[in-house]
């Protein structure tokens, strides 16, 4: 993102008006808009298909699709995986084994909204069939999502999973 237009406006305003209070107000506005735009850019990188992994075993569990709809972010399970005889992951096909029926198509996010450079809302755990407070953070260096589900809003009592972008 280029901040040159913002800086140019600020310098022009500062030279045209030597009023310090107005310059401070403009600087605050420029920084506020720039921060909001950077957070939105981070969140847009979360959209798309992601492979999920069991936080205890590290095994690939599913592919999910994250998308924006009516100002909130949704996440639906699109594919389940299982290990074959050689230990490689393959797509689990219907009819699904007991306990996996109805999992494909399950919505994992509810009330997920942008909060800075994260998504915050509620996350559903199909395994426990419970809903928790949820937070999603994008790690740009590794192109991964960190999903934190917790009993408390602060995220102290819970667990995290790392999701990797589907290639």
Language-model segments: residues:
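Short, compact, well-ordered microdomains
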Residues: 134-135, 140-147, 160
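Central antiparallel beta-sheet cores of small beta-barrel/beta-sandwich binding domains
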Residues: 52-54, 59-127, 131-133
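Acidic, Ala/Val/Gly-enriched low-complexity intrinsically disordered segments
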Residues: 11-16
